[in-house]
């Protein structure tokens, strides 16, 4: 009889604990739904930044492009040094866009927003045309931009890209 009372007492104590454990699951579901909505809004905000970036590229506005980066942001072009900070980023972009025939487009293929909502990864492809010696050359490649939320605005923290073309000289 003592064992039965003990068992019922333990069961009576555990039942409310189990029911309380169910409530966070519904709260978690609500939090996940809110996070999904926020991630969707954040993805759209980043796509807006990408669209703005493309307009600045067409206008060859290196200062405007540099402003899209975080203060401590970096651009990492192929075959060149890392440009850290707004001044170096502006200089890097100005040099690239100063190439005769420069035309660049890029398309995000995937944007992943962190569960914390303050970082995101943008992976995509680009097409580049230049004519440095009067002869048109084209390139296709891929890029990764790591975005950081600064206040309410998304800024590029790191930007790296490279060609799909084979290197010359084998």
Regions found by a protein language model. Give the residues of each.
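Bacterial N-terminal signal peptides that target proteins for export
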Residues: 1-7
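C-terminal motif of bacterial Sec signal peptides marking the signal peptidase cleavage site
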Residues: 15-17
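Short, low-complexity N-terminal intrinsically disordered segments enriched in polar/charged residues
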Residues: 19-68, 170
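Short beta-strand edge/turn micro-motifs at domain boundaries
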Residues: 21-24, 140-165
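A solvent-exposed, acidic/Ser-Thr-rich amphipathic alpha-helical stretch
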Residues: 40-45, 62-115, 137-138
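Hydrophobic/aromatic beta-strand elements that line small-molecule binding cavities or substrate pockets
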Residues: 93, 108-113, 126-128, 142-148, ...
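A short, structured loop/turn motif at beta-sheet edges
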Residues: 113-120, 147-153
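A short hydrophobic beta-strand element
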Residues: 118-128
């Amino acid at each position: 009889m003592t064992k039965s009372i003990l068992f019922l007492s333990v069961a009576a104590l555990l039942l409310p604990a189990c029911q309380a454990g169910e409530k966070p699951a519904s709260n978690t579901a609500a939090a996940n739904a809110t996070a999904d909505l926020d991630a969707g809004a954040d993805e759209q905000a980043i796509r807006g930044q990408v669209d703005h970036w493309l307009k600045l590229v067409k206008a060859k506005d290196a200062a405007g492009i540099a402003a899209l980066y975080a203060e401590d942001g970096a651009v990492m072009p192929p075959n060149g040094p890392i440009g850290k900070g707004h001044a170096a980023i502006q200089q890097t972009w100005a040099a690239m866009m100063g190439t005769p025939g420069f035309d660049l487009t890029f398309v995000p293929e995937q944007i992943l927003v962190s569960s914390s909502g303050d970082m995101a990864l943008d992976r995509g492809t680009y097409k580049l045309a230049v004519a440095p010696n009067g002869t048109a050359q084209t390139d296709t490649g891929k890029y990764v931009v790591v975005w950081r939320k600064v206040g309410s605005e998304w800024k590029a923290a790191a930007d790296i890209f490279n060609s799909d073309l084979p290197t010359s000289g084998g």
